[in-house]
């Protein structure tokens, strides 16, 4: 069978809509995906058996060396919501505040918050059949509830819209139509429970990624500068290229951080990253970013202009390397080398101070 026939046969076997409701893009490589998934399915089956044994009984999930190892190897879809809720602390928060989520929805809202959320509903996952108005049930109402409740729960953040801006504009950090709405949307797809999605969003925005979504976005800006320093330490040739062209890192990686790789990397890869993010915290984002850059260092160094650099950073988030999520996750724990929270905390302190001095 020649490649064209193999591709056509794979297209006939692989559903056009993935298990999460996303339509596969026109240029989707069905043959490569089918080949990858045939081996990944074996891994998923083995992991499912191990997780079922671990979760047997009513003891719950507690952070441990064993759980950390299991999480890094992937949480089966059927257990993902339960494990995320446990390791992130969201379950404990929800248990401590029975009825709180529903009281938020029953309270008074502000017209500006309501308008901001409604503006983004139709443009949240337009390629996902579950978020379309024609879907039954349509997840837009669930998404609205989660975002409204969170905006009322955390008024310092409210609802962070990431509006479309031209690269390099004064609001360049708020690039693309992606942000808190897309993160909440992913949570809803996995938990299928709006209250759990609310508490997981609270874990991310309130604790795991503090100040990422505040009006000043100081935490987000700080971590982008931290990545720049880590690249300077671990990949000096790439840092020199950026410095030589005067490229701001926010131009290249702001969406990686603020979207947590949603709409950037393949869905299953994002979920594997989030498995570790909920369990190990924000250093996982740095591991993913450094791995993407290091793996494609030679390709990036071929760039000869700012537009060329930007294009290469878009290209490194596509292809087999990021689609083959199991191998990719193994890479993020080996490629960047040692990366302690002590180092990240130290860099955050100095980078934050520098940003505050500038402003």
Swiss-Prot record:
Coiled coil: none annotated. Transmembrane segments: none annotated. Residues 74-281 form the Rab-GAP TBC domain. The keyword Chaperone does not apply. GO terms for molecular function: GTPase activator activity. The keyword Transcription regulation does not apply. Highly expressed in testes, expression greatly increased at postnatal day 20 and remained high up to day 90. Moderately expressed in kidney and liver, weakly expressed in intestine, lung, ovaries and stomach. Expression of Growth hormone increased the expression in testis but decreased expression in liver and kidney. Pfam families: RabGAP-TBC. InterPro entries: Rab-GAP-TBC_dom, Rab-GAP_TBC_sf, Rab_GAP_TBC_domain. Keywords: GTPase activation. May act as a GTPase-activating protein for Rab family protein(s). This is Growth hormone-regulated TBC protein 1. It comes from Mus musculus.
